Amino acid sequence: MSQLIELGTKAEMLEQLPIIQQLYPDYTLEIYGNLLDKMIPHNYKQLVVVENGITMGLAGFWIGTKLWSGKYLEMDNVVVHEDFRSKGIGSIMTEYLNQKAIDENCNMIALDAYTTNFGAQKFYMNHGFVPKGFHFVKYLKD
């Protein structure tokens, strides 16, 4: 039976490097750790779905406040292990974080999906998300 576990410490999150590398193959333990050092103080956490010691899915999340939305939960770096896709893992994480946002009295859940990731767009729309705008990016470094 799978377990849902919230991770809040750097040590716990560093153990998730193999599944993070499915999103970011070039990440080393050092790169990942340095980023976590900057993210965790800003309320970054991770939710993992684990079964028999194997992480089947991971969803990073933050709870914050913005002028346009008020209090919100942002899903970030969501990945289902390539061996466990299309088995409901993404739905389990999304439903858990939806309830967490309700419990935390958030006004909404926000996330970004790449414009080329049509599978993710369909998945989130099937879970009640609607496209609200564009997330523009201007790269400043190569």
Task: For each feature predicted by the language model, list its residue ranges.
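A conserved beta-turn-beta hairpin within the catalytic core of GNAT-like acetyltransferases
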Residues: 64-75, 85, 131-132
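Conserved GNAT acetyl-CoA-binding A-motif
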Residues: 94, 101-113
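Conserved beta-strand segments that form the floor/walls of ligand-binding pockets within enzyme
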Residues: 48, 74, 79, 110, ...
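Short acidic/polar active-site loop segments enriched in Thr and Asp
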Residues: 45, 107, 130
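Conserved active-site alpha-helix within GNAT-family acetyltransferase domains
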Residues: 91, 115-133, 138
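Acetyl-CoA-dependent GNAT
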Residues: 3-70, 139
